[in-house]
Amino acid sequence: MSCSHLSTAWSSSALASSASTTRRRSPPRSGLLVRCSLRELRTRIDSVRNTQKITEAMKLVAAAKVRRAQEAVVSSRPFSEALVEVLYNMNQEIQTEDIDLPLTRTRPVKKVALVVLTGERGLCGSFNNNVLKKAETRIDELKQLGLQYTVVSVGKKGNAYFQRRPYIPLERDLEVSSVPTVKDSQAICDLVYSLFVSEEVDKVELLYSKFVSLVRSDPIIQTLLPMSPKGEICDVNGVCVDATEDELFRLTTKEGKLTVEREKVKIETQPFSPVVQFEQDPVQILDALLPLYLNSQILRALQESLASELAARMSAMSSATDNAIELRKNLSIAYNRQRQAKITGEILEIVAGADALAG
Amino acid sequence: MKLNLYVLTPKRIIWDCEVKEIILSTNSGQIGVLPNHAPINTAVDMGPLRIRLLNDQWLTAVLWSGFARIVNNEIIILGNDAELGSDIDPEEAQQALEIAEANLSKAEGTKELVEAKLALRRARIRVEAVNWIPPSN
């Protein structure tokens, strides 16, 4: 008699437990209140963990690439330095002569070409959006000034953006390799050169992200053409920076944290140089020299843009990783709370059954 | 006497060593540079750069237009790109030459023709750089 009652009680408890396990509830409706089955919670936690691993890996890859981008800038410095020095000396030697060069010819501006550098991929915060917003702002300014304009887009994100906006005249859309090469900058250089020399446009401006620090990069606009014979770098407001000052960003570890130091290096120009013969006409020599300078400016912009993109991606993936960690913690708490509640319920049922049996 | 030779491109330093003599293609023809050469500025044309080392060995590099400055036994060559002959793969260069020749025969229109001729010239220079036999002395 006693044995028979016990068997009945266990069977009843098992049925109740099974019903509880398979019951489905509605998805969560408020912030931290999570209502779903334990299995779903478990799946969600695993999914978040996988995402965290991916974002963390992307963050580390971006950090490595920033360092490599820095090396690219450093390795191109000897060329820039030598070019500036040669350009400086050339101008000293031919100062008295009246030189007319196609790239330095200043005309009344009626049409402007805007070269916009964007990234090839996303997942880098607002990097691409910032550049495109700046481009839109500049386009509005040109409209207000009553100037015509055309856009040369470089990078997949910019290409996609401008192709969806037929009202913006797009001269060309170019794609570059994931690491800037001389071939890429040469393609852009050839395009703007032919636009300017054929007088299709009267001014060429370059819009790109200037790498300021790991957490900040500013879209800036720099006038490419017409260029100053002395090789000065001018922004759109006519403020010129002496080309002998070369800014260099360096990724360092200060007190265990990644920081960026940006130092100005004054390129020394020799005070006295001997009288130099010209194998060809000075105009012809400068014709050969200025395109080199234009190309190196564009390459530098491409490198800075890439460094900015990678730094932005590093920040974005770092934030995503932190969010994933926090979310996983919250989900784990909810999971454990539910699991504890379930166990408590089962224990209560067992105790109640035992009491009923004893009574 | 020696010459300090620097060949610089935006990507990297191609050459940075002392040499005995160089032969350079300029816009107005090839020039040879020996120690105590007169100071000179010149535009560099597309073509080979012959380098005579201190041990009298000859090397060939390929330049794709640029600028050269020779002052005080120091030669600075700036170009958008340059290649050492030892870095060029002979078979690849030969194939590129054949492809360029085929493209030239198929080119239509002025623009394509100009581009095809330029590519052919470039490929030919690279092949010559690989196959060049230095003078024996």
From Swiss-Prot, chain A:
Coiled-coil residues: none
InterPro entries (alphabetical): ATP_synth_F1_ATPase_gsu, ATP_synth_F1_gsu, ATP_synth_F1_gsu_CS
Tagged with keyword Transport: yes
Location(s), subcellular: Plastid, Chloroplast thylakoid membrane
Alphabetical keyword list: ATP synthesis, CF(1), Chloroplast, Disulfide bond, Hydrogen ion transport, Ion transport, Membrane, Plastid, Thylakoid, Transit peptide, Transport
Transmembrane segments: none
Its membrane topology: Peripheral membrane protein
GO cellular component, as recorded: chloroplast thylakoid membrane; proton-transporting ATP synthase complex
Top-level division of the source organism's lineage: Eukaryota
Transit peptide extent on chain: 1-35
Disulfide bond entries: C234-C240
Family: Belongs to the ATPase gamma chain family.
Self-association and partners: F-type ATPases have 2 components, CF(1) - the catalytic core - and CF(0) - the membrane proton channel. CF(1) has five subunits: alpha(3), beta(3), gamma(1), delta(1), epsilon(1). CF(0) has four main subunits: a, b, b' and c.
UniProt xrefs under HAMAP family: ATP_synth_gamma_bact
The protein's role, per its UniProt record: Produces ATP from ADP in the presence of a proton gradient across the membrane. The gamma chain is believed to be important in regulating ATPase activity and the flow of protons through the CF(0) complex.
Protein name (record): ATP synthase subunit gamma, chloroplastic
From Swiss-Prot, chain B:
InterPro entries to which the protein is assigned, alphabetical: ATP_synth_F1_dsu/esu, ATP_synth_F1_dsu/esu_N, ATP_synth_F1_esu_C, ATPsynth_dsu/esu_N
Membrane topology of the entry: Peripheral membrane protein
Gene3D superfamilies tied to this protein: 6.10.140.480, F0F1 ATP synthase delta/epsilon subunit, N-terminal
Main location: plastid
GO biological process: proton motive force-driven ATP synthesis
Disulfide pairings: none
Subcellular location: Plastid, Chloroplast thylakoid membrane
GO molecular function (one): ATP binding
Keywords recorded for this protein, A-Z: ATP synthesis, CF(1), Chloroplast, Hydrogen ion transport, Ion transport, Membrane, Plastid, Thylakoid, Transport
Any one cellular-component term (Gene Ontology): proton-transporting ATP synthase complex
Quaternary structure and partners: F-type ATPases have 2 components, CF(1) - the catalytic core - and CF(0) - the membrane proton channel. CF(1) has five subunits: alpha(3), beta(3), gamma(1), delta(1), epsilon(1). CF(0) has three main subunits: a, b and c.
Protein name (Swiss-Prot/TrEMBL): ATP synthase epsilon chain, chloroplastic
